[in-house]
Design a protein with these regions (language model features):
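Extracytosolic ligand-binding ectodomains
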Residues: 2-23, 31-399
């Protein structure tokens, strides 16, 4: 993930900041949100229902508001590098901003939905007012049932929008957001007719369906929507070649590891048009492909993650996983809301502030249905790298 500069306050609401070490800022711009009032001069506000039970899991911080976190610290009995990196990011966030406002309780879900549910129950039983995590969709489904039963919100890290719901918010980078950004940019730059070439898998199907829906809402045309089985790109490339004179761009929601074969198939079919993709293309395996030079894709601006990674490496002497900034932002957000949100700091109005928040990867805001909107850049592949051709927005329009 990456960074964004601190956005200005929107409207006439109050902007609250948790200023992080090294210049990182998480901004909480809470227009019309009663849950985002300035902190009292007396310091953190104790929760309306103080937690009296014993703490569970690994704990960080010593604040009055208890927050649970569920991470895949192990998988198949072995340590999980992703889980460890997210745990480290949580520690970094606590040391930066949260030690006096929250007590974070971290439980391992063993990458299992049953264990995720047990972890949620344990943390809620220990007085957690908010659950952060899990990562996997199956775990979110099981853990969110416990959170809903307890009337507590969850900020999860899955990219599967089917697990989002009121009170179950996804902080992750969603396929739908990538598609919306790249299509809107293409249309704003004169592209009116498209082809879609997508793999027959969950990611490709969701992306292609979203592209079709958004194209209709933008009054632009999808001439062909072709799907291919793994390793069988040639036929799809030929279908695109057959309509090449009718299209302005080709959308390819394919993962980085398969893109060399896709690029080869397109080259053999002599397809030459504007290629469009998503953030999974921000990978050397795609950026170095000769056929992909000039392609556009939507992604967070690299500068945010790069700055975070420098601070992470300085503290832990290792490189962070790409998901680490999700854990960092989730803990920072929880700490900031707890510090100034009164007796119910994680209420719906606070979490769904229309002005959103500015974290390590840029601006984001939660929708009432649990999905999110993120500020994304548009990148162009050039010289075996990626350059920003449309910058990440610094704030959201109201509403």
């Amino acid at each position: 993930m990456r960074f964004a500069a601190e956005p200005p306050a929107a409207g006439h609401g109050v902007t609250r900041r948790a200023v992080l070490g090294g210049g990182l800022v998480l901004t909480l711009a809470g227009c019309n949100s009663p849950g985002l009032e300035m902190p009292n001069d007396g310091g953190p506000v104790a929760p309306a229902h103080p937690a009296n039970g014993p703490l569970v899991g690994e704990t960080m911080g010593a604040g009055p508001v208890r927050v649970g976190m569920i991470l895949p610290l192990t998988q198949n009995g072995a340590p999980s590098p992703i889980g460890a990196s997210m745990r480290n990011a949580a520690q970094l966030a606590i040391s930066d901003s949260g030690s006096s406002s929250i007590t974070l309780m971290i439980e391992d879900d063993h990458s299992s939905p049953d264990a995720a549910a047990q972890a949620a129950q344990a943390e809620l039983g220990a007085g957690a007012q908010l659950i952060l995590g899990p990562v996997f969709a199956s775990g979110v489904r099981s853990a969110s049932a416990a959170a809903k039963s307890a009337g507590k919100p969850m900020i999860a890290f899955s990219t599967d929008v089917s697990v989002a719901a009121p009170g179950v918010y996804l902080l992750s980078f969603l396929i739908q957001g990538y598609v919306d950004r790249i299509l809107q940019y293409a249309v704003s730059n004169g592209k009116k007719s498209f082809a879609v070439m997508t793999p027959q898998n969950d990611y490709g199907n969701v992306a292609a369906d979203r592209f079709q829906d958004r194209a209709q809402s933008l009054n632009v045309q999808v001439v062909v929507n072709t799907r291919y089985a793994s390793g069988q790109m040639a036929g799809a490339a030929q279908q695109v070649a057959a309509v090449q004179g009718q299209i302005d761009a080709l959308f390819i929601p394919e993962q980085a590891d398969a893109m060399p074969a896709v690029a080869s198939a397109l080259g053999q079919a002599s397809v030459k048009t504007q290629f469009l993709g998503t953030g999974v293309w921000n990978d050397p395996r795609v950026l170095k492909l000769p056929q992909m030079q000039g392609a556009w894709f939507s992604a967070p601006d690299n500068s945010g993650f790069d700055a975070f990674a420098l601070r992470y490496k300085a503290k832990f002497n290792s490189e962070p996983a790409r998901l680490a900034t999700l854990a960092y932002d989730a803990v920072t957000l929880a700490a900031a809301l707890a510090r100034g949100g009164g007796p119910d700091p994680f209420n719906q109005a606070a979490l769904t502030s229309v002005s959103g928040f500015n974290g390590a990867d840029g601006v984001f805001r939660f929708r009432a249905d649990g999905t999110n909107e993120r500020g994304l850049a548009v990148m162009q592949i050039a010289d075996d790298g990626a350059k920003v051709i449309s910058p990440t927005p610094r704030s959201f329009a109201a509403g």
